[in-house]
Curated annotation (Swiss-Prot):
Keywords: Activator, Conjugation, Cytoplasm, Plasmid, Transcription, Transcription regulation. The lineage of its organism: Bacteria, Pseudomonadati, Pseudomonadota, Gammaproteobacteria, Enterobacterales. It is found in: Cytoplasm. GO terms for cellular component: cytoplasm. The keyword Cytoplasm applies. It comes from Escherichia coli. This is Protein TraJ.
Length: 228
């Protein structure tokens, strides 16, 4: 899905080098992984966060999302799609890497000298502020109360949302591109934390349902599939 009508966006009048300098000035020290690649898929600029993200070692026995080459092939296919859409096109997609879920934004930028580049920006997905639970299980936003949702990484949060809705680990693993074991390992520490306040996990699940807190988890799932 393109964010804007490309016909309303004139070609970039600056040079490629000038554009890259502008990107570098903005993202040099940013925690957001960013890179710029040309039509031949050569990296013209990558910040430190991008280099660090894609320097992780492969884990061949942990699923495709742990193999850098597989992830790079998928992202390159998205880049080709962005190039084909032409100047001004921009879209977001989600992908899995090392068991974590990310959202990538790609934007095609073309110049008057017939050069073009694709800007990559990568963020953890999703990134929501979530409610906290106090020891009686009631909903609160007070920072000194027990937090459950707020302590979860984006990847664990999506697994937890599926699990809370009754989806089994095999299906969760298939949907997220991770192993069954990875799905189980993400849920175990959350269940241990919940057990401190609820005798059974299902009591916690029912509590979230009748208090309407389950709606937050449904919104995560809808968001997840909305950018797939």
């Amino acid at each position: 899905m393109c964010a804007l009508d490309r016909r309303e966006r004139p070609l970039n009048s600056q040079s490629v080098n000038k554009y890259i300098l502008n990107v570098q000035n903005i993202y040099r020290n940013s925690p957001v992984p960013v890179c710029v690649r040309n039509k031949n898929r050569k990296i013209l600029y990558a910040n430190g966060a991008f280099i660090e993200l894609f320097s992780r070692e492969d884990k061949p026995l942990s699923g495709e999302s742990y193999i850098r080459l597989q992830v790079e092939i998928f992202l390159s296919s998205l880049e080709l799609e962005c190039q084909a859409l032409g100047h001004g096109s921009a879209f977001c997609r989600r992908f899995n890497f090392h068991g974590e879920i990310y959202q990538i934004r790609m934007e095609n930028v073309s110049f008057y000298n017939d050069e073009s580049v694709v800007l990559w920006q990568i963020n953890p997905f999703p990134d929501y502020p979530f409610f906290a639970l106090n020891q009686s299980g009631s909903n609160t936003n007070t920072s000194d109360k027990l937090t459950i949702w707020n302590d979860l990484s984006p990847g664990t949060l999506v697994v937890f949302s599926f699990y809370m809705l009754g989806v089994g680990h095999a299906t969760i693993a298939r949907e997220l591109g991770i192993t069954d074991r990875a799905s189980e390992d993400r849920i175990k520490p959350v269940k241990r934390k919940i057990k401190e306040f609820f005798e059974h996990f299902d009591l916690f699940r029912v509590s979230c349902i009748y208090k309407g807190e389950i709606d937050s988890l449904l919104s995560i799932i809808r968001e997840f599939y909305g950018v797939k």
